[in-house]
């Protein structure tokens, strides 16, 4: 019934017909933002979904910029508004980390520096602890006689905590010399002969009182960091909801219209479709005339033979085109009362075959 809306959409497809290529790839990179918007409203968004939102906003920004330049559709916001949203996400979270986790599975810090002072303090403490392990690594490297930090690794396992590791061959080369060595960390003397050395098939693990103490403190801080990360993530998503919820809802409608228009254009080009003509009828009249009607999905899946299109004429038959006035369906549908010349339905036998 809403002919104006249909005509508007058809006109938009005609306008974009030769210009949709630049935004087609961007549309393919946009996630289901309607679903993401619902999850933001419920504050049930996961960190990895935040990455989906971020990537989607980058592509949406390109679509909005395109529309700002060429005026096909008026976007609900400016590219500057989207830049603000994008920067809000980028400055708050480390997206290289958040993209790996559901909220319950977060195991490292993903909050950017300057967002939460408690997290920053705990991260600073852990950086100091880790630097002590690097002193130990540098001590071993001095005997390996190499500046390549990859020769000696610093690893951590849940059960064993922190330990240093190097190949069995390298350790055997320095074993005699390094076992008589020592180092001082925070005014405390550590004798290498007191270290625990675990020799494995191809590598050696090195533990000591220093690595044990650091492991305990580091893990204790990390647990606090993870819990604070979950709280801050929830708080920030709630802030985004208050600030950008309306914008997201408007973008959902905007992208849906652009996506539908591009889909119409691609289908029309592929199957050589043409626009329908809307016939003006009275309030109590309905009419539809479909000649050589084709179904894009069925036609695309046709594997054998030739797709057979259909002709359908329904409603007020007096409105039928002149060339179809002699159509057998129209002739046989005429009732005794010529004032009520309507076709209310078609009974189809069989299926579309070739």
State what each model feature region is.
Residues 1-353:
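Alpha-helical coupling/stalk and coiled-coil linker elements that connect catalytic or binding modules
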């Amino acid at each position: 019934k809403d002919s104006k809306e249909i005509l508007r959409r058809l006109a938009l497809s005609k306008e974009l017909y030769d210009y949709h290529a630049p935004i087609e790839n961007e549309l393919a990179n946009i996630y289901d933002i309607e679903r993401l918007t619902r999850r933001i409203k419920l504050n049930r968004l996961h960190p990895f979904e935040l990455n989906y939102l971020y990537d989607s906003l980058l592509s949406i920004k390109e679509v909005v910029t395109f529309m700002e330049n060429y005026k096909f559709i008026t976007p609900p916001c400016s590219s500057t508004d989207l830049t603000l949203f994008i920067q809000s996400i980028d400055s708050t979270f480390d997206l290289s980390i958040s993209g790996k986790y559901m909220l319950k599975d977060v195991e490292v810090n993903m909050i950017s520096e300057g967002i939460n002072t408690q997290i920053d303090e705990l991260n600073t403490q852990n950086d100091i602890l880790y630097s002590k392990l690097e002193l130990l690594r540098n001590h071993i490297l001095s005997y390996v006689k190499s500046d390549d930090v990859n020769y000696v690794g610093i690893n951590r396992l849940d059960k064993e905590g922190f330990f240093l590791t190097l190949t069995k061959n390298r350790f055997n080369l320095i074993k005699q010399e390094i076992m008589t060595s020592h180092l001082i960390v925070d005014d405390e003397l550590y004798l290498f002969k007191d270290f625990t050395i675990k020799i494995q098939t191809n590598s050696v693990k090195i533990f000591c009182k220093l690595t044990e103490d650091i492991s305990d403190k580091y893990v204790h801080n990390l647990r606090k960091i993870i819990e604070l990360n979950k709280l801050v993530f929830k708080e920030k998503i709630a802030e985004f909801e208050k600030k950008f919820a309306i914008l997201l809802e408007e973008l959902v409608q905007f992208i849906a219209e652009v996506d539908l228009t591009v889909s119409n254009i691609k289908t029309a080009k592929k199957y050589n479709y043409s626009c329908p003509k809307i016939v003006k009828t009275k309030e109590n009249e309905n009419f539809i005339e479909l000649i050589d009607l084709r179904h894009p999905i069925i036609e695309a899946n046709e594997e054998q033979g030739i797709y057979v299109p259909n002709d359908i004429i329904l409603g007020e038959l007096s409105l039928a085109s002149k060339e179809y006035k002699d159509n057998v369906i129209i002739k046989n549908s005429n009732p005794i009362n010529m004032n009520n010349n309507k076709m209310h339905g078609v009974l189809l036998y069989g299926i579309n075959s070739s």
